[in-house]
Amino acid sequence: MNGKNLKEKSSIKYLPQRRKAVSLIGLGIASIPFLGVIEGIIWGKFDYRIRRKIIYFDDLPEEFDGYKVAQLSDIHMGSFNIEDYKKIERGIQMLNEENPDIFFFTGDSVNNYAEELKPWLPLLKKIKAKDGKISILGNHDYGIYAYGVDNVKKQQENINKIQEFHEEINWQLLKNESLQIKKEKSYINIIGVKNWGEGNFPKDGDLELASKNIKDGDFNILLSHDPSHFDAHVKTYYKKIHLTLSGHTHGMQFGVEIPGIAKWSPVKYRYPKWADLYKEKDRYLYVNRGFGYLGFSGRVGIWPEITIIELKKTV
């Protein structure tokens, strides 16, 4: 047998093994997205992350220098099972360990029905904040996806029940109104509006009504569920809104985030301001990625969020 024939037979012998190896590698690569989805369904939706921001303001009252704000949004308690209690409790414990001065919830307590909140009231009542717990409505809190957009009576009943539940856990629900947080002789205003969103979402948020007691020179924080409200009205509003806190987008519960390098989700094509901190001139918007989930029963790359913001006075 000459060398040429030996080489040909050797190639024939090992070619199927090479094909098998390449097939296995290809299968492994192809399975990565599938495994990512499985991971997101089993663990990702409970992989709570604390997102920290320090924001400086020239006109923050000195008494509020270092004031710590905690924010949750889009808890969607109707998506969870009671077997998830311990996992969700861990997220609440993470928030409480931050020892916030004030707690804000920026809408979407439920998916459709107020009653979805009821089993979770004892757990949500465990949230602690020294100066109070303030909440607003999101589009899902209206019940429009269950009762229809024209059934105003049922919507109002749903909202009233949600307000009762919020009161039961010591969350003060603001519906186009404001309140003051006082420290010594200084104060800041917390403004809360009903849902206002671009497109077919409810546009009940009335910034003029909600800020009627705000004076020139006041320091103002706005709670508004949908971040599209910021670009549509808030950033150019004649009364200065220093910081707006929103949610709504969930970061689509899918995307890629590499801190300091990349942040992408398909939701960016619907909401340009879809997650984290944005600034327009001297006004800030923070968009929380959501604590719960809706639709897809998981999170891939965009993890459930607990926001901690420290307000600082510029020296």
Where are these regions (language model features)?
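Extended active-site neighborhood of metal-dependent phosphoesterases/phosphodiesterases
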Residues: 51-56, 119-193, 199-202, 212, ...
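Active-site-proximal beta-strand elements of phosphoester/diester hydrolases
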Residues: 66-79, 187-196, 221-225, 284-289
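Membrane-embedded segments
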Residues: 67-154
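Active-site neighborhood of phospho(di)ester-bond hydrolases with catalytic His/Asp-centered motifs
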Residues: 72-73, 103-107, 133-139, 174-176, ...
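Conserved beta-sheet core of the metallophosphoesterase superfamily
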Residues: 227-307, 315
